[in-house]
Amino acid sequence: MNEVMKTILKRQTIREYKPEQISDEQLEALKQAALRAPSGRNGQPCHVRFVQNAEMLKEMNTDFKELVGYDTPAYTRWDTNPVYHNAPTFIVLFAEGESYMDGGIMCENICIAAEGMGLGTCIIASVGALFADGNE
């Protein structure tokens, strides 16, 4: 079995992360994986942001809790387990219009690249509500 297939089969959702930030080299590789994702008619309708600022991540977590209303048991545990699972790098994808397929391809490129570097990932679709007004 080739290395690409091994990496794809090895990838799984991870929800616990080490506090150390990824290296600049790893960050650049993830950016390249995102940018090299194919899109329909090469329309490139997706954008990606890499958030590594701890204060911004805390603010995003608070905003998300307020947005969804977290008085249900599933959400109250976020007091100790933020929506981003304490990952030191949080990647946000934006897809224009109905470009969900293109966004999914970009997301998978990032996840497979991360797995190949020994980095865990967790795809969280619901945080898109934070940016519903179009502001990135």
Put a short name on every predicted segment.
Residues 1-136:
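Acidic, surface-exposed loops and disordered segments
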